[in-house]
Design a protein with these regions (language model features):
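Long, charge-dense, solvent-exposed interaction surfaces that engage phosphate-rich ligands
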Residues: 86-88
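ASCE P-loop NTPase motor core, strongest for the SF2 helicase catalytic module
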Residues: 1-81, 90-351
Length: 351
């Protein structure tokens, strides 16, 4: 394809080229075209740097080299929070961005309510959580003291992941010691599916395959018909699951891996959405919720983010708000998240 000259090259879901050094980004840059267009619902997912490769595809060199952009914009905006740098970048990008929100292009869409559903861990689950939190807090702060925060990123990531898994259920921890399935979230989800929304269809998203497996077992125990897919599901099986959920009244629940089901799906048969393990990237969760809140939907949508009170999930909500503000101001992967944490952030998250 690189030998052909096109009139137009259009990249749909252009956030796929946000990494300038990835193979897909380098391949896209080889395409020859008189006109180029990027389309994305989430051009900025993790940090300011996400927009660099997309803009470099559209207007090569406009934002300078990778290192120039990092020093002039990425570091000052993401790490130092400098408003003048953010405003300067916004002005540069403004002539090349046409932003249309769903509210502007689909004004007849029904109402969508997003609700944080706080769950209080029972004593058994809380005791396991606190034991791991104390252990990782001491390990990580000791590592930061001895090696600095940059060299402690792997330990931070591991600690965050373990605490998140315990918030779902300690049973999904990949440890030598096996823990029972203490899960207040699973109990609450089962109660809602059985009692509160027995006449409705729901999408249930989780980032953890272990949690999805626990939910599958619970649905089978309750006799609730469901369909399922994750990243390993073949394209034909995925399409079959979608059609069954959309067309068969008896199938009430669609279980989906968050990474596998965040984009490219139209699931308007559902009017309830559950994000089992919300995390730091609100854009990913928003895309998941919007699998059902889209053109063709006739019912009001209720989206629940399930959060364990007084946990790592609870604390991360405040960091999410910062990321939403960043995307809004400029556009008017876990590792990237950890790179932006300060020692004070780490102490807060593990406190």
């Amino acid at each position: 394809l690189s030998t052909l000259e096109f009139d137009y090259v259009i990249l749909d879901e252009s956030q796929a080229i946000k990494n300038p050094s990835s193979k897909v980004t380098r391949a896209a840059q080889l395409l020859q075209a008189k006109h180029r267009l990027c389309m994305s619902g989430t051009p900025l997912q993790n940090n300011t740097f996400d927009v660099y490769a997309q803009m470099n595809f559209l207007n090569p060199g406009m934002l300078g080299s990778v290192e120039f952009f990092r020093q002039e914009f990425s570091v000052p905006i993401d790490k130092l929070g400098e408003p003048d740098r953010k405003e300067h970048l916004r002005k540069i990008l403004y002539p090349f961005i046409l932003r249309r929100t769903k509210e502007q292009v689909a004004k007849d869409l029904p109402e969508k309510q997003e609700i944080v559903l706080f769950c209080e861990m029972e004593k058994e689950q809380r005791d396991i959580y606190e034991a791991y939190r104390n252990d990782y807090r001491n390990q990580i702060l000791g590592s930061i003291e001895n090696q600095g925060i940059q060299r402690s990123q792997l330990a931070i990531l591991q600690g965050l992941m373990k605490l998140r898994q315990i918030c779902d259920s300690p049973a999904i921890l990949n440890e030598k010691e096996e823990f029972p399935n203490y899960s207040i979230k699973l109990d609450e989800l089962a109660r809602q599916l059985k009692e509160d929304i027995s006449d409705h269809k729901a999408l249930v998203f989780s980032q953890f395959l272990g949690m999805l497996a626990l939910i599958r077992s619970k649905l089978e125990e309750l006799g609730i018909p469901y369909v399922y897919f994750d990243g390993s599901t073949s394209a034909p099986d995925r399409e079959k699951a979608i059609q069954q959920f959309q067309k068969q009244e008896s199938i009430r629940v669609f279980l989906i891996s968050l990474k596998a089901g965040g984009v490219g799906l139209n699931l308007t048969a559902a009017d309830y959405v559950y994000i089992m393990d919300p995390w730091w990237n609100p854009a990913v969760e928003q895309q998941a919720i919007d699998r059902t809140h889209r053109i063709g939907q006739t019912k009001n949508i209720f989206a629940y983010r399930m959060i364990c009170k007084d946990s790592i999930e609870d604390k991360i909500l405040k960091l999410q708000e910062r990321k939403k503000a960043l995307a809004k101001d400029i556009i008017s992967d876990d590792t990237g998240f950890v790179k932006n944490l300060t020692r004070e952030d780490v102490e807060y998250l593990f406190s």
